[in-house]
Amino acid sequence: MAKRIYNFNAGPAVLPLPVLEEMQREMLDFHGSGMSILEVSHRSKWFEDVLDEAIVRIKRLLKLDDTYQVLFLQGGASLQFCMVPMNLALPGKPVSYVETDMWSTKAIQEARIQGKEVEVAASSGDREFTYIPGQVKVRPDSAYLHITSNNTIRGTQWHSFPDTGNIPLVSDMSSDIFSRVFDPKPFGLIYAGAQKNAGPAGVTLVIVREDMLKRVPKELPTMLKYTTFSEKKSMFNTPPCFAIYTVSLVTKWLEETVGGIARMEEQNRRKGETLYRYLDSQDYYRGTAEPDSRSLMNVTFRLPDAALDKFVKEATAAGLGGLKGHRSVGGCRASLYNATPLEGVEALVDFMKEFVRKNG
């Protein structure tokens, strides 16, 4: 087998090696079935057990009580931009959003397309989305407040969530779910495309509080209602079985190998601090996010434009992949998701030092 690289892609992203190895072992014969997990029926006991285990582990890891349901949908976070206002808006009430990057802007646009009254409670667009707003003013009659907990393009992250009182929080946690401890109680709904911290592309986690399900209008199309999936345990139609199986293995790894979310957060802080400490110690590379808003998941930085292509090319040749920034902003981005090892971050820092020595 070719040597595995250190994968800093923003998503689809690195998966834990023990998970990949377990998938490899089970690929041709899943639990004595004589079939691959790719072949078993979603109505079989084999897949039922996979689904049940994934739900139990997610609830245990995030400390979700019985008022929350865990659903597995398709369509990515982009479909949730549409489904959230469609399902959770209330007649005569505005829906509130905090705008912190391109993805939250897209969520706002989807709500407006539906004719919802959208209130932008705060925005960091005045400084190119390089920070998380400190003041969030939510109208007291808002149906919900939507935030993007981590912003992959600009490399910013909420380090404490806004206090909204009785107004439910809704969050896109696609890029930092399972990465740190947080209190789920203020959240009416959390959604996350799996392909960064939870599994492969193809499945979207939706964690919804049961009182929010009472808002879902009956006249919505069947496949666009959260209640369709809550009532059928995510199996109204054929679910993305292999992706859910992978999520189950990732959550098993988080529990049994890492030791839970608190331990995962400790590891993520060490990784982030290692790279940020180096960025702050020199002036060739320049971090783009304001220090108090820096993301532990996506570290964004720039270097002289003339050197960018050379940096990315040489890094790739050195086994450091996926460092090119998002096409909308350029620069570089190192995504340090849960499965990224500390030694990978240390190897990146060593490469950056050597690149400066040769080119600075």
Curated annotation (Swiss-Prot):
It is found in: Cytoplasm. The modification N6-(pyridoxal phosphate)lysine is found at K196. InterPro entries: Aminotrans_V_dom, Aminotrans_V_PyrdxlP_BS, Pser_aminoTfrase, PyrdxlP-dep_Trfase, PyrdxlP-dep_Trfase_major, PyrdxlP-dep_Trfase_small. Keywords: Amino-acid biosynthesis, Aminotransferase, Cytoplasm, Pyridoxal phosphate, Pyridoxine biosynthesis, Serine biosynthesis, Transferase. It comes from the Bacteria. Pathway: Amino-acid biosynthesis; L-serine biosynthesis; L-serine from 3-phospho-D-glycerate: step 2/3; Cofactor biosynthesis; pyridoxine 5'-phosphate biosynthesis; pyridoxine 5'-phosphate from D-erythrose 4-phosphate: step 3/5. Pyridoxal 5'-phosphate binds at A77, S78, W103, T152, D172, Q195, N237, T238. Its main location: cytoplasm. One of its GO terms (molecular function) is pyridoxal phosphate binding. Binds 1 pyridoxal phosphate per subunit. Catalyzes the reversible conversion of 3-phosphohydroxypyruvate to phosphoserine and of 3-hydroxy-2-oxo-4-phosphonooxybutanoate to phosphohydroxythreonine. This is Phosphoserine aminotransferase.
